[in-house]
UniProtKB/Swiss-Prot annotation:
The species this protein was found in: Debaryomyces hansenii (strain ATCC 36239 / CBS 767 / BCRC 21394 / JCM 1990 / NBRC 0083 / IGC 2968) (Yeast)
Function: Required for cytoplasm to vacuole transport (Cvt) vesicle formation and efficient autophagy. Plays a role in ATG protein retrieval from the pre-autophagosomal structure (PAS) and is especially required for autophagy-dependent cycling of ATG9. Also plays a role in regulation of filamentous growth.
Subcellular location: Cytoplasm; Membrane
Major location category of this protein: cytoplasm
Protein name as it appears in the record: Autophagy-related protein 23
Amino acid sequence: MTSPLRFEADMSMIEGEKLSPIKIPPSRLSTNTTSPDILAKHPHGLSAKQDARRNTVHNETPKGLTATPLTKKAEPLYSVNKRIPLTSPRATNQPNLDSLKKSKTKLDARLYELKSSSRHGSPSNKENMHNSGKSTQASQLSSDVNSSISHKSPFESSPSKIDTPIKQINSSFAKNVKSSPPKSSPSKADKRSIEDDSVIENSRKIAKVITNANESEVSHHKSDDEHSIQIDQVFNKEDLVGRFSSGASPAKLHEPTVIDEDSDGDIYNNEVNTSHTMTSKMRGNESTQLSRIIKITDEVDYVTPQRYTEPVAKSPEINQQHRIKENVINNTESKETISPLKNHMLSVNSDQKENHVSSNRMEDENSDGFNELEDEPTINFLLSPNSKPVFSLDHIKKVQDDHFKEVANLEEVINNKNQEILKFSEELSATNNKFLIYDQKIKELKQDKKKLIANENLLLIQLKHNERELASMTKALRIKENTVTQLESRLSKSKSKYESTANELESVIEEGNTLREQIKRLEKSVEDKSISQKEYESQIKILNDEIKEKDTEISSLTDANIDYNIKVENLLSEKEELLTETGRLGRENNGLEEINSKQQELLEELDKLENLAKDKIMTLENTLDSKTQEIKQVMTEKNELLTKIDNLTEENKNSGRELQQYKDDVEELTNKLNNYNNARSDLDDKINRLQEGLNKSNEANESLQNKVSGLLEEIERLNQHVSESETQMDLLKSINTEKDEIISGDTKKMGELVQKVNKQKQVIADYEKDYSKALEDIKSLQSKGENTSLNDEIEDLKKQVSQGQAKTNARIQEVAEQLYFEYSKKHELKVNQVRASFKKQIDNLHFEKKSQARDIDSLQKKLEIVNMEKNQLLRLIDEYQSGSDHNPKKKLSPKKSGIKKPSRY
């Protein structure tokens, strides 16, 4: 019986693999680089030189133009792909057993055909020739199957092939019935020859059936071989008629040679183990392939002793003298049995005694008696013709009757043996059917195992894919964190810049306040001067020079009035500009509402907006730099203003000196006061108007102070916004830490699941080991022939194996479903969380962008206001300088001043 396949578990997929969601496993894709790997596998030494010199052997066609060591694919020296000839010394390590088996089977078939044609040349044996040809073809097929048994399962043969031995046995029984000898026949010699041929043919057919019933069972069951050997011994030892009638030698008729075409290496082990008698040992020696070939060549072929031109027939024995000597030595004890005429009664008594001897003793003594009876005609032929013995008819009839009885007994024995063979063949067919059923179950189990392995591979691929996705997500999160940190750094820089600009604005505002205080001081000094002038006017009423001073004061006051009118116009223009800006801001607010409505559309263009945001940030930074430069310019201009103020103080001192000179002039102008008495009333009116203008300018200063306070409030609001953004950043960091904790928990769960899978695989391996042990037990039990009593145990073992396999399959399926469900949920949750966090971050970025744009606009407005104030101050200073440079006695024209010329007295 053929042995079932070993159920080996393929556990190499997971051994040594450590799964982690963050670390991406190295890719197994082969790179296109050629030089390093090929140089590492480059053959070197004498073997490389010898292989390079053999241009015709093992030469692979290169893919490029020429075959060089770099372009040739490196292979080991003793690879299976290289077909080494049998004569080379390298073939010692790799024997080509398949080709030897095929050639051996072909030789066996051919030699058997030659032998059968040489022995059975009569037309009555054509059927045997036909059957032998079929058997040789079957043997070739069986040998091919046995040669490829390492690649196929042992029970892949169809049931129709297993039923063929039973059909052959039935056909052989039919031929035995047809070829059984009749009781009465006209010619006794023909009758004996027919009986001998039929007995030999039947024995050979039965032996052929036994040997070819299951060709693969020879190497696994010693009991079947022993049984077939015993049957062959019975047929060969009891074949008396054939030995008497045929002219062959006793050495040739001692045992019929039955050729088994599927004789492999297992036959030698079986024949060495079957050591029953000397005949079995001789058969073991004769069953080798070389001994068979030598025997057949001795029987069929011709020998050329000296030359190859004239063949000489080989005689088995040239001289017959040794037979004469043996017969003379053997006949010293029983001389009377040679001739039935001298001592007929003794021969009869000896025959009767021999009939009563036990079967074992007769089997031992038959060979010597047969040799004597077979040698007798040759001895008589060699002696003189007058000395030939004459046999009586009674003796011949008696011998014939004995032979017929023996033939009948042998036929009964053959029928009994054939019945036993039928029983055994039925049992074999039943066992083969059982084995086929078991094989189908094994195939189903293997298919289930393959499916499980495929499912495991799919699960591993899914796990690796999920790990890669997790790694990519972690990388994306890290990239986003880096961007957030960059934005934080930019925000901190912008905050510092805002603080610096705010400080600079405060300094500028303080400087403006100082300038305003200085202006107030100057105005107070002017008022003091006017008071002093009034005092001087009260004291010097008579002088006409005092009128001139009053005229100069009137001209200065008219200039100041003109300046205040210009300031009022500027303030009105600024008011209109503020109104226009408020309208524009309202429109922008409406635009912002529309933008909020279109926020969903803008989410699709997040990537573009991020790039635009980066560009805008760069532009904002550039604008901030430009603004800082402008602020620096303002500072320089401020310094210039300070220098100008110093100059003005010096000019004030000079003006004081000039006042003393004016006092001197007042004494001279006392005479002209009478002319200007009428103009005093007009001057008083003008002074009132100027006071009203001063009040308006004070109100404008208060409005400017309110604006400055509003700017300070906006700066505070910006600081609050920055603090809120910092809190949001802290929240994002906490969310990231929570996500890291979730990922670590997932990794732990992954490790636990991997451990569970490994445990399940160990359980599967244990079940497979139990299954293999059960199969081995089944094989051993079937080899012993105890199928009837142990089928229940086999079925129980199969049930246990099937139940264990079903449990493992169900458990693996449950684990796979749980893994898939958990990972799908986690993946969806993580993706949703990441999306929400990214949306929040993007919204925050948009809000920060808008707030920064607003802050920049407000700062630009503040800078414009500061520039306007600076320009106004510069105008005032220039006008003051221009007024101081002119002659104080010079009067303003009425067209420019808009004041009526006073009437003189």
